[in-house]
Amino acid sequence: MFVIDTLLFTIDFTRFPGNSTEVKLEPGLHVIYGESGVGKSSLVQHLSGTHGNYPGNFDLEIEKCPHMIQIVLQNPDSQIVSDTLDGELAFSLECNQTDSAAIQSTFLALKEELPFSINGSRHPVTLSGGEKEILNIITAFSTAPELIIMDDCLSFLNRRMKSFILEKIQQKLRANNQIVLWLTSDIDDLQYGASCWELSLSSLSQFTPGEKPIFPCRKLMEGSLNLEIDSMSFDYKDERKLFKQMNCTVNNSRSLGIVGANGSGKTTLASLILGINHPDSGAIQLKLKGDNAPTMAYLDQFPERLIGEDTLENLLQKFLSIGKLQVHLHKKCITVMERNQIKWDLIRNKSSYDIPWSMLRIALIVILTHCEFDLLILDEPTFGLGWTQKVNLLQYLQRYLKQKHIIVISHDVEFVQNICNVVLSLDDDSITTSDLIQIERKDT
């Protein structure tokens, strides 16, 4: 088969006559930045031939496109097909090869590429969000496709791990003469591109670097969130010990940040705070205003897990029925969503699985902040959000913190530094800012 080593297409924004752009991409890493909701995933679907007949804000005419295409999806769970890590690594190889010796050799090489130790019989669902993203990247490149399209699929990774994975990607595309098109909501990712573009609702244009904006700063008043961890140990069965005799004390926090490398135990610590999991030994206790049992709500890094296939409308009605949401705040909650470009009437009766991830995440944050909980725990709240959307979320949560308390679990150190007054670091990837109280974990 004749190899096409160029991706050439014209994008035409139909509601803006004359606003079209021709894009020519040759082997290398190319980055398109865009805020959530501008059409990044729609562009992926157009390029891969999976776009439906529903209207969008642009049309695409593809003039040249490689034959062998691999897509890496935004939600890492959507790409995992096997019930073991070994099976996941071998799946693509077995679909594309018949030589068992070659499959075994490549499989072992892929296993070596994982930057974390694994038990091959472990279920992929037990990996952290970032570890799943790494797994999907490795399997996507395993069959040496000519074009790899990455749909905001590195947003769970901290800076150090993201740089490490991108260097591995650069090595592969140089060796195999591949085109990698990476669509991202993180403006910092533009630094990695051989060509850099910005997608908006009205245009796709080459990105012009400028001075990076900064988050608006607001000093938080002292809070009453206290966390005591005393000689706590915990591990998942047959896996490495995440916490070994860990000790930590947090006093009078208004907003507590939990940061750390991918797989360091951030989400697991949240499950221990919530009582979903329990320490193997030692103790962990959270108090608020002297209350040993504050009411808490947790928004998972995979937000659809909060309601499953149910709808946001039903969730609101449940909160109303149990008294967690007051009737007079119901309308205000919907108004706040509308201000954040969330069209309530369009999503209210949709299954959570049919709502774009970032939209679902923001909608759930708005709902939970209008309910009567003493403490919110937000796991990766900025995932998939562009710079302006992060600023809007920051300012919204800063207003919420005048009365309430939150715990923010995130790899997004810059966001954590600006929304939290105390930060617990689960590894040595330290935060350096004079305005924060930083607490390092202490394990024996």
Per-region residue spans from a language model:
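Conserved H-loop
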Residues: 177-185, 404-410
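ABC-family nucleotide-binding domains
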Residues: 151, 158, 379, 385-386
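Conserved ABC ATPase "signature" region
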Residues: 102-119, 328-347
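ABC ATPase C-loop
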Residues: 141, 368-369
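Helix-to-loop junction immediately C-terminal to a conserved catalytic motif
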Residues: 48, 274
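The feature captures the beta-strand-to-loop junction immediately N-terminal to the Walker
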Residues: 33-35, 259-261
